[in-house]
Amino acid sequence: MVRRKLRLLVILAGIWLVGIVVYLFKGDDQSEFEKRVIDKGPDGFYVHKEEKEHQPFQEENKAEVLHQVEDQWKKKQDAEITQSRQTFIETKKLLPPDDELGDIPWGQFDELGYISKTTLKPGQDPYARNKFNLQASDNIKSNRHVPDTRHMNCRSETWSQDLPDTSVIITFHNEARSALLRTIVSIFRKSPDHLIREIILVDDFSDDPSDGQELDKIKKVKVLRNDKRQGLIRSRVNGANMAKGKVLTFLDSHCECNEKWLEPLLDRVKQDRRNVVSPIIDVISMDNFDYIGASADLKGGFDWNLVFKWDYMSAEERNRQRQNPTAPIRTPMIAGGLFSIDKSWFDELGQYDLKMDVWGGENLEISFRVWQCHGNLEIIPCSRVGHVFRKQHPYTFPGGSGQIFARNTKRAAEVWMDEYIQFYFAAVPSAKHVDVGDISERLALRDRLQCKPFKWFLENVYPELKIPSVQDIAFGSIKQGNDCMDTMGHFADGILGLYPCHNSGGNQEFSLTKAGEVKHLDLCVTLVDTRPGNEVKLYQCTPGNYKQQFVQNPAKDQLRHKSYDLCLDSVVWQTKGIVANKCDPSSYTQKWTFSLSKNR
C-alpha cells in the first residue's frame, strides 16, 4: 500500500513538472522560449535546438509517462501538450534554420575570451597589424555608447512599420577582433531584431580561421570562409549569394552603427527598389577611437583621375537641405563600403564585376551602373554609421595596390565612360597601357539593361564635374622632364613643388582654363607679388582676378603671367616652392607641358 502511494506521488510530481513546462511554453518572450527549448534534452517532449527539423512528439513516450493517470486528467494534459507542440512548430517556422546559425545571444558572447587571444604583448607596436591603434580598440567594450550625431529632426521621424528585412554582409581579412566584434554588436544593439535576418561574415582567408569561427556561435551570425584570398569584391558576392534577406546591407569590418541607422535605409529601399542608399559616414579616430560626427553637407564625387572624393553640396542643394534636413541627398558616387540595396535589384544589375581584383574601383563601377541603368544613389541623413579611416592599407595586395586599382578603374571606364574616357587617360596617362582583360560580359550587361550614356550622367547627375574639352585649353599633369608640378598636399595658401610624375592625377592634376586660370580643383595658382623670385600660391579661384591669369606659350613651353613678364619657375622649388621669375626661353626650369593640350 505504501509502495503504491509512493508510486502515485512520483507520478503526480512528474505531471506537475510537465504542467510547469507547458506553462512556460505559453510565455510571450520568444528568446526565453527558445532558450528553454535548447535546455531540454532530445529524449523528452521537445526537440533539441541542434536538430535540423522539428520531430513530432512520440505518443509512446507520453503514454509511458502518463499511463497510470486518471483518464480525465490525461486527456486534459494531452490537449495542453498538443497545443504547446503546435505553438513550438509555428514558432520554429519563423526562425532561421538552426543548423545555420549560432545559439548564443550576442549579449552572452564571451567578449573577453575572444579578444584576449590577440592581446598585444609589451613592446609590440599597436599600429603594426591593422594600421590603427589596436590597444585603444581592445580597451573599448563592444557595447560602448557613441554620441547620437543625427539632426534633431531625425529623432522624431517615423518609418514604415512594414519594412523588409536585411542580410548584413561584412567581409574581413585579418581584422582586429575587437573592431570586428564591436561592428557586430553595434548592429544588434542599434537595430530592431526582426529587421536583421542574419549577419554574414565573409572571412577572406585570414591567417587565423578562428577569428571568424568563434563568432559563428552568436545567434543570427553566419561565417563563410574563403578557401583562398579572393578580395573584397568577390567576397561580397559570395556573401550576397548565400543571403536570405530581401535587402543586402554591406558594411566594413571596423564600423559602429548609430541610433536607428537601419530603418531609414530600409524605408527608402522599400519606397523604390532601385534606390541604393548609404548612411552618412561618421569618423572613428584611428588613434584613440573617438567617435566624431561628419558633416551632412557632403556628397560623393570624383575627379577625372576617377579617385573618390567628398564634394560639398552646391549652395542650392544646401538651401534645400536646410529646409528639410531629413531628405535624401542625391550623390554621384558612394564611398562603397557602406550601403543597402534590394537583393533582387543587386542581382538584376549584375552584382559586381567579378573580373575586378581584390579592392578598389568597385564603388566607381557600381555608382556608374546604378545611375546609368535607371537607378538612384542617395545618402540618407538620418542614418549614421561610424567608420575607422586609416592612412594606409593593413594588408598587401597580390600584384600591388596601385596596379590593381588602375586595372579595376580602367575596366569601369572602358565599360561606362564612352568617349569621355579620353579625359581619364589625360589625367592618368599610365592607364593607357594597363591590360583590363575581357570586358565583353559587362558591355553585354549594359546593352541588356538598356543603360544610358555617360553624357547623360554628366548632364543630369554630376554637372559639377567640369568637361575639359569644353572649358579648358589644357588639362592633366604639368610636366617638367620626369617631374610634375605638385600641390605637395597643400590647400589654400599653400605653395607648389615638384615631384616625380606618378600619372595618377590627385595632387598632380591641373587645368588651364580659357580665362587663363591654372587650376587644381577649385584653387588657382596665384601671383602674390609682382617682383621676380617670389613664390606663387594656391588660393580660391576668383573670376576676373588678374593675379590668377596666365597664358600658355606652346612654342617655348612656358606658363607666363598675362600682365607681367613673369613665368612659373622651379629653380628654387626645394626651398621656396614654385616661383615667378623673369621669363627666359632658354631656362629649363621654366619649361612646362600639359599631358593634354588643345594647343598641340
Swiss-Prot record:
Cystines in this chain: 154-382, 373-451, 484-501, 524-541, 567-583
Protein localization: Golgi apparatus membrane
Entry keyword annotation includes Transmembrane: yes
A GO-annotated cellular component: Golgi membrane
Ligand binding (Mn(2+)): 252, 254, 387
Positions in the Lumenal compartment: 29-600
pH dependence comment: Optimum pH is 6.0-6.5.
Activity regulation field: No change in activity by addition of up to 10% methanol or glycerol, or 5% acetonitrile. 40% reduction in activity by 10% acetonitrile or by lyophilization. Activity requires divalent cations, the best being Mn(2+) (10-20 mM), followed by Co(2+), Mg(2+) and Ca(2+). Loss of activity with Cu(2+) or in the presence of EDTA. Inhibited by UDP, but not by UMP, UTP, ADP or GDP nucleotides. No inhibition by galactose, N-acetylglucosamine or N-acetylgalactosamine sugars.
PROSITE patterns xref list: RICIN_B_LECTIN
Catalyzed reaction equations: L-seryl-[protein] + UDP-N-acetyl-alpha-D-galactosamine = a 3-O-[N-acetyl-alpha-D-galactosaminyl]-L-seryl-[protein] + UDP + H(+); L-threonyl-[protein] + UDP-N-acetyl-alpha-D-galactosamine = a 3-O-[N-acetyl-alpha-D-galactosaminyl]-L-threonyl-[protein] + UDP + H(+)
Primary location class: Golgi
Ricin B-type lectin domain boundaries: 466-595
Molecular-function GO term, any one: polypeptide N-acetylgalactosaminyltransferase activity
Designated name of the protein: Polypeptide N-acetylgalactosaminyltransferase
Residues annotated as transmembrane: 8-28
Organism: Biomphalaria glabrata
Metabolic or biological pathway, per its Swiss-Prot or TrEMBL entry: Protein modification; protein glycosylation
Listed cofactors: Mn(2+)
